Each structure stands twice: as structure tokens, then as C-alpha cells.
């Protein structure tokens, strides 16, 4: 099993007035499985992912795959990657099939192989019936699913997903998590988000990022162990929720099935 290794990785942005460390001295290794990169907006998640896929060059440190620096691997490494950025470009008047064929051509995939993969991927992401519809008619959830499909066209060994559930409704979010969970069995999947529920049930490892550094890493059980017995879930009125939110550290609020109440 090949390993993706980040060693002493840093990214510094400089201008005439100041410098900002977007990523600070990260060392971590990835093998097959789903890795949840959790952190608020601006924590450095996107910068880290752009370095992993080779869009950004680290200021310091290195990234290796199977012991070889990715800069030396060049196109060989890029062929191992599948990438879904937070905002990915597409031609609005293309149908789903035409768009995926276009991406397959860019990735130099043989047309016969591409046809079979596209059919399989559309089924995997639940878009078979929408295959001939134009992308401009797709909902946000459908676009994220076609984004997953394009990232998987080259059967990547490393799948990078940057805020893949952004803007999705709860039902689409669940569907997306189910898709991602199945993908980590034979590849490295790195998923970034600022929403805890996106990773708590599907990630083999969770990495919490703040100000460019990892402040906590481990399994879900390991992450939650220090707060065992200190977290409660309850159903309260909206007024009580406001009072509790002002007094305690509330991690999540959502509407309850009971009218006028929240969980």
C-alpha cells in the first residue's frame, strides 16, 4: 500500500507590509481510508489541499508519494489524483455526459474506456436519469455529484474533496456522505469541511485544523474522549435555546420535529 507523506509542510504568503503563515509545519501520513480535515473558514484547509494536488508550491517542507517527492513524479503523480475544488468550473450548456466526456478527453482517457466509466459513475452518484440534461438545470447537490464523478474518471489513488457538501440541503448531505464513505476502501480520500456532521460518521481519521496547524488528530472516539460526560443533547424551546447559547458552549442547533423547539 502506497503512502502519501507530508513533512514539515509550510505555506507563507508575503507582501510588503506583512506575512501570513497559512499552513504551519505540518507532518502527517495518509494511507487508504477517509480523512476528515475539519476547521473553520480560513483555517488553512484549502491551501493545504492545493499544495497536495500541486497547484501551490510549499514555502518549506515536502510532499512525497511512496517515498518520492511529488515534484519529481510530475505527470505520474497527477494521474493518481482526483480533485473536486470548492468551486469547480463547467460549461452550463453541456449535458452531464458531454461534460464527463470532455473531462475524460482532458485526462487522456481512451474513449471506449471513458464511456464505460461514465455510465458506471453516473449510476454511482445517482445521475443516470439526468445524463442528458444540461448542467445549468442541475441543483447544487446534483452539481456536487457530477463533480465527484469527474474527479473519479481516472480511477484516482488519491481523492481530494474541498468542502464538497457546501450549500447542500440535509438530504443531499446524507447522500453525499454515503457516496464518500464507499470510496475510501481502496484509495486515500481527504475531505475538508467546517461542518462536523460531514466527517463524524465516515472519517477513519479526523484532523482538526486551526490557524494553519493541526490542533487535534485521531479517530472520532479519540477526539471525543476528553469531553466524555461533558456534552449533552436536549430538546428545548427557541427561547431556552437562546439563553443556553449565551451561557454555554453550544456546538450545534437544529430544528426539532416538535414545532417551536430546537435540538
Where does each model-flagged region fall?
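Walker A (P-loop) phosphate-binding loop of ABC-type ATPase nucleotide-binding domains
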Residues: 40-44
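ABC transporter nucleotide-binding domain
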Residues: 176-262
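A short, flexible loop at the N-terminus of ABC-type nucleotide-binding domains that lies
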Residues: 1-6, 10-25, 31, 73-74
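Conserved ABC ATPase "signature" region
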Residues: 101, 105, 112-130
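Helix-to-loop junction immediately C-terminal to a conserved catalytic motif
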Residues: 53
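Conserved ABC transporter NBD signature motif
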Residues: 61-77
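Catalytic Walker B motif of ABC-type/P-loop ATPase nucleotide-binding domains
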Residues: 159-162
Amino acid at each position: 500500500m502506497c503512502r502519501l507523506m507530508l513533512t514539515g509542510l509550510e505555506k507563507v504568503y508575503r507582501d510588503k507590509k506583512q506575512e501570513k503563515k497559512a499552513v504551519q509545519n505540518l507532518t502527517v501520513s495518509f494511507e487508504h481510508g477517509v480523512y476528515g480535515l475539519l476547521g473553520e473558514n480560513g483555517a488553512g484547509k484549502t491551501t493545504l489541499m492545493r499544495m497536495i494536488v500541486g497547484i501551490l508550491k510549499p514555502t518549506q517542507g515536502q510532499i512525497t508519494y511512496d517515498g518520492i517527492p511529488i515534484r519529481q513524479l510530475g505527470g505520474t503523480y497527477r494521474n493518481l489524483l482526483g480533485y473536486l475544488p470548492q468551486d469547480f468550473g463547467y460549461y452550463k450548456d453541456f449535458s452531464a455526459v458531454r461534460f464527463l466526456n470532455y473531462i475524460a478527453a482532458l485526462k487522456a482517457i481512451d474513449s471506449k474506456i471513458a464511456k464505460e466509466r461514465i455510465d458506471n459513475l453516473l449510476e454511482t452518484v445517482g445521475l443516470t436519469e439526468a445524463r442528458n440534461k444540461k448542467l445549468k438545470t442541475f441543483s447544487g447537490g446534483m452539481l456536487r455529484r457530477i463533480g465527484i464523478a469527474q474527479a473519479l474518471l481516472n480511477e484516482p489513488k488519491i481523492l481530494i474533496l474541498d468542502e464538497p457538501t457546501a450549500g447542500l440541503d440535509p438530504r443531499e448531505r446524507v447522500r453525499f456522505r454515503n457516496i464518500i464513505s464507499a470510496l475510501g476502501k481502496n484509495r486515500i480520500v481527504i475531505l475538508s469541511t467546517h461542518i462536523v456532521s460531514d466527517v463524524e460518521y465516515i472519517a477513519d481519521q479526523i484532523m482538526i485544523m486551526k490557524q494553519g496547524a493541526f490542533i487535534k488528530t485521531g479517530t472520532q472516539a479519540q477526539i471525543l474522549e476528553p469531553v466524555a460526560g461533558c456534552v449533552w443533547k436536549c430538546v428545548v424551546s427557541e427561547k431556552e435555546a437562546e439563553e443556553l447559547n449565551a451561557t454555554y458552549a453550544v456546538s450545534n442547533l437544529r430544528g426539532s420535529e416538535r414545532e417551536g423547539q430546537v435540538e
